[in-house]
Amino acid sequence: MASLTTALPNKAVVAHFMMGLTYNYAQSDFQNDIQNAISLGLDGFVLNFGNDSWMMSKLTLMYNAADALNLQFLLYLNLDMSEMSTVPASTLVTYVQTFANRGHQARINNNVVVGTFLGQDINFGQSSVNQGWQVAFKNALASAGINIFFMPTWPLDASTIYQTYPVADGFCKWNCWPYYTSSPTSDAEDLVYIQNSKATNKKYMATVSPIFYTHFTSKNYSFFSEGLWFTRWMQLIKDQPNYVQVLTWNDYGESTYIGPTNYAADFPVIGSNSHEWVDSFTHAPLSYSLPLFIQMYKQNTTGLPSNFSGISQLYVTYRVHSKNATASSDSIPRPDNYQNSSDVISVISFAKSSYTLRVSVNGTVLGTTNVNAGVQSANVSFIVNNTAAAGLPLFQILNGTTVIAQGYGPLNILGNNSVVLYNFNFCTTRISW
């Protein structure tokens, strides 16, 4: 067995982990998360955290969990500066010092990896943002014997960010959703990041996410997510950034979770409770595509990767009501940007040979499409006569006219007059043959 390493490998794929939801977690919860992540081909977790009084104890449990498992899996801290904008740099330095020499702490060029969420406007009393992070943070850590690889997530101009902020050794770009548009997400900004990271001999971490939807009183919007998982992965496979971060492992409040739902989590409540759009809406079946997409990225291929087992797979995602339906009992309005969603069932296919896919609800055929061998995607509308086709979707795999496999979706699609609460999250299933 190969010895464990703390070096974050080239083309590592890591997942964003929301430590703020782990107040009730035991070490066993973290161990389960790590084991599940390893089974999906992930190389590590990016531990996003704020300044909660209990946070250090939970971060310690996460690192302890990695030690106890003694498996190849890396961790690094991600300072959530949206929560810690007034925290002194000396406190942030202490956080990094606490875990810098742990056995599963990720390193690049033997330097401790540290990220942020925001922080691009904080100077810690220095003359500039660059000087602030350099003097009060990086230099302070270096004086304590800890050299870091600083890779913040700062939403700034990709064409100048590397040149303007040399304090960073690399950057992560957060935005991977189509913001307030019905057009598919673009990789134009990624290409600028990649070009400039190479020009400055630095690194770039791109991001991928399955969906975005949140439905709180003060935060109520969705982004066009139909087909996003496939589209974004295929972009990153083509573009080949240094690293990829999956957004997210466990953010239930924003529906971006790709890991199995852990009900020990402290589900966010802001007027409404995120249990309303997460319970029964597991994304785990979609997560089973992760090992395949990760291997495609690492092997730089848009065809079937080497870890494809030969068993064909159809991954299905869909919302349970039309974007135009009116909820009868929701105290919160329909989410902002709802109109840019698409009333379709999205599928991703990893198949050894071509086939025909037929999708129906209660005997009404919604669509029939020919799917080629390899890695493909398709969308089928669930609207019939200007309303959602109510019932449980049936997915049939046909060879000619012979059904060779079939499966139902996990949840009924609701008719336009049957929606009680809005939910723009999607449910998922997988069919194998």
Curated annotation (Swiss-Prot):
Entry's EC annotation: 3.2.1.59
One annotated GO biological process: ascospore release from ascus
Keywords: Cell cycle, Cell division, Glycosidase, Hydrolase
Pfam families the record matches: Glyco_hydro_71 (PF03659)
Location in or out of the cell: Ascus epiplasm
GO cellular component: ascus epiplasm; cytosol; mating projection actin fusion focus; nucleus
Domain of life: Eukaryota
Top-level EC class as recorded in UniProt: hydrolase
UniProt xrefs under Gene3D superfamilies: Glycosidases
Disruption phenotype: Abolishes ascospore release from ascus during sporulation.
A GO MF term: glucan endo-1,3-alpha-glucosidase activity
Cystine pairings recorded for this chain: none
Catalytic activity annotation: Endohydrolysis of (1->3)-alpha-D-glucosidic linkages in isolichenin, pseudonigeran and nigeran
Function: Promotes the release of ascospores from asci by hydrolyzing 1,3-alpha-glucan in the ascus wall.
Protein family: Belongs to the glycosyl hydrolase 71 family.
Official protein name in the record: Ascus wall endo-1,3-alpha-glucanase
Organism (species): Schizosaccharomyces pombe (strain 972 / ATCC 24843) (Fission yeast)
